[in-house]
Amino acid sequence: VKTRNRKIVMPVTEVVPKKEFFDYEAKYTEGLSDEITPARFSEELTNRIQELSSEIYDILGCRGIVRVDFIVTHDGPQFLEINTIPGMTPESIIPRQAAVFGISQTDLYSMVIEDLFTMV
């Protein structure tokens, strides 16, 4: 999230599917996956994911809220995709990450809206 000319990198969320693959059914059927924030990763892995997310955000020239997804393998984090319009329902990942970071959903929206005025 880039707000008020400052970038905030949210806590990492670990998605643990209860099926072999994290497919549409696993994502949208209650009980078929767990979303754990903050992730149960080592500090080193968490920092690497946050650094990569920040670099990708800058390289792509992002503004506002995005979600950067990775798959973590034995070789480390592998970039999967960037969601430039991530879900923002109370059940979505970004609002939960913001809450863990200490930012309410209302404050999160306010920061992004205020940042839009710096573009003018």
Predicted features along the sequence, with ranges:
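Phosphate-binding site of ATP-dependent enzymes
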Residues: V1-E51, V72, P77-Q78
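Short amphipathic alpha-helical segments
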Residues: Q50, S54, Y109-S110
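Peripheral (often C-terminal) accessory segments that flank ATP-dependent C-N-forming ligase machineries
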Residues: E44-N47, I59-L60, I65-R67, I71-H74, ...
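Conserved metal-phosphate-binding beta-hairpin within the catalytic cores
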Residues: V1, Y57-P90, A98
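Generic C-terminus detector
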Residues: S92-P95, A99-V120
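Cytochrome P450 core scaffold surrounding the K-helix E-X-X-R motif
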Residues: F21, T89-I93
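Active-site anion/phosphate-binding pocket segments in diverse small-molecule metabolic enzymes
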Residues: P11-T13, L52-I59, R63
